A protein has these predicted regions:
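PRPP-associated nucleotide enzymes
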Residues: 2-162
Length: 162
């Protein structure tokens, strides 16, 4: 994966449900008018915020989970053909998990209508084929492992969870 001097861990805020409730309240105006009947949260990051967005909108919530590092619809969750879904995630950096979520939803008959995220770290480099909204856009430089700047060379790469 990419390396950076900064890491934004949404799990630190998502452990406080009053904060999650407020973040979802702020996100609702961006997502409420798409006619969705279900919110989909990619594991792990989309679970807490996705469920709270669904609760506040009065919608069903399902999640996609990792199987062999790929998102999959499991636990007998099903979509009705053409069911309109919102994808809700905590952070996007390159957008790979959201693209996987969009693909999985379509493969199971759903129609994704929008994406909502707490933090967009993509620096404008992601684009999805549905509208996407974020509460915050943060721009931290990222680097390939073989192209680290001098100040990061020799530092230990850590991945506290993603």
């Amino acid at each position: 994966g990419l390396h950076s001097a900064h890491f934004f861990q949404c799990a630190q805020v998502c452990q406080y449900m009053d904060k999650v409730t407020r973040l979802a309240e702020i996100m609702l105006p961006m997502l409420k008018d798409y006619g969705a009947t279900t919110v989909v949260g990619p594991a792990m990051g989309g679970l807490v915020i996705g469920q709270e967005v669904a609760r506040q909108l009065g919608l069903r919530f399902v999640f996609l989970e990792k199987v062999n590092d790929q998102l999959a619809l499991r636990r007998n969750f099903k979509f009705v053909a053409g069911e309109k879904v919102l994808i809700v995630e905590d952070v996007i950096t390159r957008g790979g998990r959201v693209v996987e979520a969009l693909t999985q939803c379509r493969a199971h008959g759903a129609e994704p209508v929008a994406v909502g995220v707490i933090v967009d770290r993509s620096q404008g480099k992601t684009s999805f084929d549905v509208p996407h909204h974020s509460l915050a856009e943060l721009s931290f430089p990222t680097y390939q492992a073989d192209k680290l700047p001098p100040e990061l060379q020799g530092s230990e790469a850590i991945k506290p969870g993603s």
